[in-house]
């Protein structure tokens, strides 16, 4: 038998056999690192051979406040030796100070025959966290020092079930998580430079015959230990030393045993005044009180501020000016000394979600988003820091979507052109697409603006007349405005010969099969009007032509084509009809890559128009349905979740259009993939979103076991090289574009999205995690900071 350490009373005594020596050393280092137990108060005792514990050594066990027994295979074998077992039964008593740690063995009912108090011992395993080891020792020491009231859970002596005992131990463990929960400090705020008496009320009884001390441990200076005076058996008083401002931890020692810990705060006079003013001038509470919002409600304040800002914004909004304004000359403006430098920072700090969504549509939104406060935080990180993770996600996705729109438009327009003016002009045409499709889907302006060009009977200045009508004009002006809107809406929904949105279908229905319908009779001479009919087009050959094009040519063929108008279904367009209608739509000289994307309001109008054509609804009912839909959209737009859904819909639509553009010119069922490198050492990055807690799938292929007869005679390097240079093809489904595909499967791989460079400048590969030791769990973040350097040793082998 071997004992290491100094003689006297010990806080922790570790009983182990030779096969658990590494675990004994690990526990000693762990306890010393926490500063709760001093070095000369830890003792280790190794049980050797089949020798019983002597009477002198039994006194060592009796004077120890807690005993940890490492149950390894070698130690358990000694239980079958009667002299050793009898000495252990005397040494491991009383049961409240014994902690058993299963180290390579499992629990069973046979141990109850060896020790009658087996189920009263605290139980630990090799895969527990270090905090569990510390808490078990602190609990045993507290009970041994007379602090019986640390936990109110009574020990049930008659329980013989393993599961019932584990449940009781879990309850005790939860009730004694921290000794700091059982302390009351008055006062807990101390003025610097002022002599202050601090009173500490304990929940456990203190011994008046033992010296009690309080140790103050500031971060930037050495610890100060002060002798405390015992006011009664539960209360002590101590003169606080003069320390600098900040939070100072303190520990209470009864003799050499730490019986509690807590913290106090030192502050200067100015810091105290600042704290009082900050509590009294809370901006949210102040505004709730000013606007008479009782009880205080963030949601009500958010709604009120959002509506107030909307009233001061023009009806058509400010999104026509874009949100991409950035400061390029003076970059120092991106760093401010204020905590909340902009209104966007303020709304993100206090979780004003609707106000944040509205501010993101105002000019300069990206510039405000790029400004860091004095702590280096941006609006999105401020929102997450204060617990508004959904708001953080919305801000990130909104900024990324705006960047996707800008990048995609520029990529479309700058193909083969160097004129930046073309891009600048085009940017103004699609700058409000984000607003129309995400935050304001039911706006009147974009609907009536789109209808004004499609209604043949409308005058040229109809939309201008509608916008120029003001509320401060006489009542007749409002009536005229309402009449104009209703008239346009009715003519649009009547469809028939006009068929506004489906321009290609309207040509075929309005003018029929007569190719010269658009030619006026009195305009041209008679001989031109009586010309012979146009020859019938030749029918297409029914016999399929042999496809002599090479396979590789199909894959790499690039067809320069513009996206088609999404309002016109491909199956309804007559390719032989080339004559334009009399009143043609005004065509812009600038190509708009998003011109065919329908907003929610346009899709609703098209749906109602189709129902009117089919006779399901009449025009009056369709008008009522549309107005009801607009009212419902206006109410729903006040919901933050509704805005999130619309933003996601727009992002999916843009992604589908980008994917379709990439696949244009290629065969519909062929796609070039990245060469596959066959290597077991390939490092991969799990496919996991920034807001998700786990990867979507395992990127590493399952290991293939080698079997007899499975060896290859080829060279490994040549096989890998040939496989890495070979391209694979796979079948893919065609992806439809446009926002009208609400019922489509919008599952787009997150890895295929091009993330905006604004929220994250670079994607960094995560550092490789250390190898997990066999049968030893990973050490999580719950480990104390000062314990990170200690790793548990491997578990001893099981006994046979």
From Swiss-Prot:
Feature: compositional bias, Low complexity: 714-737
Alphabetic keyword roster: Cell membrane, Coiled coil, Cytoplasm, Membrane, Phosphoprotein
Coiled coil: 643-663
Taxonomic superkingdom: Eukaryota
GO biological-process terms attached to the record: cellular response to insulin stimulus; positive regulation of phosphatidylinositol 3-kinase/protein kinase B signal transduction; regulation of inflammatory response; toll-like receptor 2 signaling pathway; toll-like receptor 4 signaling pathway; toll-like receptor 7 signaling pathway; toll-like receptor 9 signaling pathway; TOR signaling
Compositional bias segments (type: Pro residues): 767-777, 791-800
Entry membrane topology: Peripheral membrane protein
Localization of this protein: Cytoplasm; Cell membrane
One MF annotation (Gene Ontology) recorded for this entry: signaling receptor binding
Main location: cytoplasm
PTM section of the record: Constitutively phosphorylated. Phosphorylated on tyrosine residues within the YXXM motifs by BTK and SYK. Isoform 1 and isoform 2 are phosphorylated on tyrosine residues, most likely within the YXXM motifs, via CD19 activation.
Polar residues bias (residue ranges): 749-759
Description of how the protein assembles with itself and partners: Homooligomer. Interacts (phosphorylated on tyrosine residues within YXXM motifs) with PIK3R1 (via SH2 domain); required for BCR- and TLR-mediated activation of phosphoinositide 3-kinase.
Purpose of the protein: Signaling adapter that contributes to B-cell development by linking B-cell receptor (BCR) signaling to the phosphoinositide 3-kinase (PI3K)-Akt signaling pathway. Has a complementary role to the BCR coreceptor CD19, coupling BCR and PI3K activation by providing a docking site for the PI3K subunit PIK3R1. Alternatively, links Toll-like receptor (TLR) signaling to PI3K activation, a process preventing excessive inflammatory cytokine production. Also involved in the activation of PI3K in natural killer cells. May be involved in the survival of mature B-cells via activation of REL.
Domain characteristics, as noted in the entry: The DBB domain is required for dimerization.
Protein name per Swiss-Prot or TrEMBL: Phosphoinositide 3-kinase adapter protein 1
């Amino acid at each position: 038998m071997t004992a290491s350490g100094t003689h006297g009373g010990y806080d922790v005594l570790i009983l182990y056999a030779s096969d658990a020596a590494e675990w004994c050393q690990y526990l000693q280092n762990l306890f010393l690192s926490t500063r709760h137990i001093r070095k000369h108060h830890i003792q280790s005792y190794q049980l050797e051979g089949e020798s019983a514990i002597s009477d002198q050594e039994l006194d060592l066990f009796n004077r120890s406040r807690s005993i940890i027994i490492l149950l390894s295979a070698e130690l358990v074998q000694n239980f079958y030796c009667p002299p050793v077992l009898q000495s252990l039964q005397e040494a491991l008593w009383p049961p409240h100070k014994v902690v058993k740690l299963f180290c390579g063995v499992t629990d069973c009912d046979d141990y109850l025959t060896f020790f009658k108090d087996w189920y009263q011992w605290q139980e630990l395993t090799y895969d527990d966290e270090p905090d569990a080891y510390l808490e078990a020792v602190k609990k045993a020491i507290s009970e041994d020092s007379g602090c019986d009231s640390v936990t109110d859970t009574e020990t049930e002596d008659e329980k013989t079930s393993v599961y019932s005992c584990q449940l009781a131990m879990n309850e005790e463990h939860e009730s004694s998580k921290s000794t700091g929960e059982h302390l009351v400090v008055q006062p807990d705020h101390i003025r610097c430079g002022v002599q202050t008496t601090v009173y500490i009320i304990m929940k456990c009884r203190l011994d008046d015959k033992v010296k009690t001390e309080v140790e103050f441990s500031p971060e930037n200076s050495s610890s100060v230990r002060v002798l405390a005076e015992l006011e009664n058996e539960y209360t002590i008083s101590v003169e606080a030393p003069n320390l600098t401002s900040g939070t100072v931890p303190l520990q209470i020692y009864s003799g050499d045993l730490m019986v509690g810990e807590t913290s106090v705060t030192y502050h200067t006079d100015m810091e105290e005044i600042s704290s009082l003013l900050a509590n009294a001038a809370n901006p949210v509470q102040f505004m709730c009180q000013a606007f008479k919002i009782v009880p205080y409600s963030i949601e009500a304040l958010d709604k009120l501020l959002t509506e107030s800002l909307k009233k001061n914004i023009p009806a058509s909004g400010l999104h026509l000016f874009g949100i991409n304004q950035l400061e390029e000359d003076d970059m120092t403006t991106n760093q401010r000394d204020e905590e909340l430098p902009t209104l966007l920072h303020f709304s993100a700090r206090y979780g004003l979600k609707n106000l944040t969504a509205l501010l993101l549509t105002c000019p300069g939104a990206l510039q405000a988003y790029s400004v860091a406060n004095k702590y280096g935080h941006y609006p999105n990180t401020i929102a997450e820091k204060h617990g508004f993770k959904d708001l953080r996600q919305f801000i990130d996705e909104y900024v990324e979507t705006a960047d996707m729109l800008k990048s995609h438009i520029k990529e479309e327009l700058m193909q083969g052109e160097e004129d930046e003016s073309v891009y600048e002009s085009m940017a103004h045409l699609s700058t409000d697409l984000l607003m129309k499709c995400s935050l304001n889907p039911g706006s009147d302006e974009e609907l009536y603006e789109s209808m004004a060009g499609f209604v043949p009977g409308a005058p040229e200045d109809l939309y201008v007349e509608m916008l120029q009508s003001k509320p401060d004009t006489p009542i007749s002006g409002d009536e005229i405005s309402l009449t104009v809107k209703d008239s346009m809406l009715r003519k649009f929904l009547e469809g028939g010969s006009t068929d506004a949105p489906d321009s290609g279908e309207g040509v075929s229905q309005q003018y029929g099969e007569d190719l010269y319908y658009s030619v006026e009779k009195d305009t041209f001479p008679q001989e031109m009007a009586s010309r012979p009919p146009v020859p019938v087009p030749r029918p297409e050959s029914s016999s399929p032509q042999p496809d002599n094009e090479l396979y590789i040519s199909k894959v790499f063929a690039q067809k320069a084509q513009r996206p088609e108008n999404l309002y016109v279904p491909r199956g309804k367009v007559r390719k032989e009809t080339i004559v334009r209608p009399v009143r043609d739509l005004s065509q812009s000289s600038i190509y708009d890559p998003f011109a065919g994307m329908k907003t929610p309001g346009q899709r609703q109008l098209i749906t109602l128009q189709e129902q009117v054509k089919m006779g399901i609804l009449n025009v009056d009912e369709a008008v009522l349905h549309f107005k009801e839909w607009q009212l419902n959209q206006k109410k729903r737009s006040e919901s933050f979740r509704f805005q999130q859904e619309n933003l996601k819909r727009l992002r999916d639509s843009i992604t589908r259009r980008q994917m379709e553009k990439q696949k244009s010119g290629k065969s519909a069922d062929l796609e070039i993939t990245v060469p596959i490198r066959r290597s077991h050492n390939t490092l991969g990055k799990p496919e996991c979103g920034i807001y998700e807690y786990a990867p979507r799938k395992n990127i590493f292929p399952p290991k293939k076991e080698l079997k007899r007869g499975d060896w290859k005679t080829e060279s490994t390097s040549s096989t890998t090289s040939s496989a890495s240079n070979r391209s694979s093809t796979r079948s893919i489904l065609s992806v439809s574009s446009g926002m009208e595909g609400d019922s489509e499967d919008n599952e787009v791989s997150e890895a295929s999205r091009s993330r905006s460079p604004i929220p994250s400048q670079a994607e960094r590969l995560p550092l490789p995690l250390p190898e997990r030791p066999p049968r030893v769990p990973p050490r999580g973040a719950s480990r104390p900071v000062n314990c990170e350097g200690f790793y548990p040793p491997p578990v001893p082998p099981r006994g046979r």
